[in-house]
């Protein structure tokens, strides 16, 4: 019924065809570079890391204590081929400003407000949110404030219930509940230390002596700053308010049933595996993966966690015929004979295709050719001819899912040779070349505009859909039949 997009390049081909603003991708891609930035948010200088194309689905990474976005240094390059990845440092942590007390009264509500305004300033109203440790309280508050922003959640050692917290830690949290006396503040501050950081990094790790010391060395810089230590101490004192908010977070999860992935270091000294199961109690379809490691699971298992995220949130291809349209809901009978429901929203991009005069195919044309092995070469199933401004879209040769064994080639035509029953196209992408035979029976098309009025029962469509709430699939881009021309992809 569904077919994951094969690679980001294949997805870019589709995105351009649909004139969509998003690039939809499949499995974890090659490493892409991470860039480093500062933003002014609520009068504070906030540091953040960024990777990937902003046209792709956005993955917001919310770090833990006493860490920073440095926690995601290995994860971000692995996901940048599929997602637009952003990872801010909270005020007083990492490279973000640590404002004095008169300028910033730390609490999880306040940190959430800063992150909320940061996300809004980037124009990112839809997010998959990755939460670890302190990221849980921030991410869940963000979800409660803006449920329409949330396209999915990843919990990594971040709790929503008390049974996910080690008993010794629960006793400590109870001891700092209530008015912040000097004794309570001293107890909270005793945990804001390099010793705590080392415990969280090393306890439960498979090979603690093989861990990269850059992690806790980076944290040590913030822990040595008096204003940073004060801010982190204030956040420790605010943890009882997170515990009080657990029922609201659980209710939100039960109501919205977001697409949820749980990746958990089972040897975490403070957040135990019962915390992962508690999430699945609220979201029964949540997927859980345990790792034989500690609190900072990414230190040892970033490769597999990246694979899990990429696979779990990968969009799917839906091909079929519209059965019904009710408001923003489109029901499709897929080509495999199944029923698939698609949800439309303001981000859904619509397009159609129209026939292209194959006699106009000439050297210099930029095309996307879906093909299958035929004889000693490739035989085209269809060819999309791009407008000049779309040159370079999805350039390369890669697997495609139109038919068994099919591939997609985005390339420039270097030669056209007339042959009986069709023509051969010599194609170049980068330094590579190949030949594709285009039979007269293969559709040759180009882009045409379309609107929601073209989504009518009986029309054929090709959609790229991403996971949404309640097990639904949100249509990011749709190519629909128009004027009798069916989308061949």
Task: Identify the residue ranges that each predicted region occupies.
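Serine-hydrolase catalytic-loop signature spanning alpha/beta hydrolases and amidase-signature enzymes
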Residues: 66-74, 85
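Bacterial N-terminal signal peptides
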Residues: 12-25
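Alpha/beta-hydrolase active-site loop signature
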Residues: 66, 91-94, 160, 294-297
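Short, flexible, surface-exposed loop segments at domain boundaries
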Residues: 307, 314-489
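Catalytic active-site module of serine/aspartate enzymes centered on a nucleophile-bearing elbow/loop
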Residues: 285-313
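Flexible "cap/lid" subdomain of the alpha/beta-hydrolase fold that forms the substrate-access gate
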Residues: 32-38, 42-46, 51-54, 58, ...
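Structural cue for short, hydrophobic secondary-structure segments
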Residues: 61-64, 87
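Active-site glycine-rich loops that stabilize anionic/oxyanionic intermediates
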Residues: 64-67, 133
